[in-house]
Amino acid sequence: MALITTGRGMIRDLEKSGSLAVYPPLEGGFEGRYQRRLRASGYVSESITARGLGDLAMYLTGVHGVRPPHLGKKTVGNGPAVGYVYYVPPIVNYKLEHLPPKAKGLVLWIMEGQILSSQEIEYLTVLPKSEPRVKVIVEMGGDRFFRWTPLQNTLVPA
């Protein structure tokens, strides 16, 4: 890999396809450099991990209920003793509403994406088509150098 990389190729491919699968080196460091280049080109970056997301569509674009660990505390009354449900706003819609006026859009950077199912990856490829200001980057594993491919190419035909 070159010592000085502008990241223009990745940004151009991201704008063209809407979603990318990236394979950064396992020793780390490259993700932060490319996120910094995305922010310098006008995007707002949001990093999340794929572990524990649950229903991806509801977590990203719908109001969803969250029940935190009860730690011995139970609800009072006649309901089930499993704790209260707190409702959380959707991450993507909330971030889009609060984008700076000059921002190009929102880049959703998802770490540990190799655990996502093919249905969830397919949803992530459709998300930028339904909301053009959202771009998706999913880390799909490691490689010896930083490389990327359109996320659509990682889907295996059934």
Swiss-Prot record:
Species the sequence originates in: Trichodesmium erythraeum (strain IMS101)
Keywords, alphabetical: Membrane, NAD, NADP, Plastoquinone, Quinone, Thylakoid, Translocase, Transport
Subcellular location: Cellular thylakoid membrane
Function: NDH-1 shuttles electrons from an unknown electron donor, via FMN and iron-sulfur (Fe-S) centers, to quinones in the respiratory and/or the photosynthetic chain. The immediate electron acceptor for the enzyme in this species is believed to be plastoquinone. Couples the redox reaction to proton translocation, and thus conserves the redox energy in a proton gradient. Cyanobacterial NDH-1 also plays a role in inorganic carbon-concentration.
E.C. code: 7.1.1.-
Protein name in the entry: NAD(P)H-quinone oxidoreductase subunit N
Subunit structure: NDH-1 can be composed of about 15 different subunits; different subcomplexes with different compositions have been identified which probably have different functions.
Pfam families assigned: NdhN
Membrane topology: Peripheral membrane protein
Gene Ontology cellular-component terms listed: plasma membrane-derived thylakoid membrane
Gene: ndhN
Principal cellular location given in the protein's record: membrane
Reaction(s) the record says it catalyses: a plastoquinone + NADH + (n+1) H(+)(in) = a plastoquinol + NAD(+) + n H(+)(out); a plastoquinone + NADPH + (n+1) H(+)(in) = a plastoquinol + NADP(+) + n H(+)(out)
Source organism superkingdom: Bacteria
Family: Belongs to the complex I NdhN subunit family.
Single Gene Ontology MF annotation: oxidoreductase activity, acting on NAD(P)H, quinone or similar compound as acceptor
InterPro entries, per the entry: NAD(P)H-quinone_OxRdtase_su_N (IPR020874)
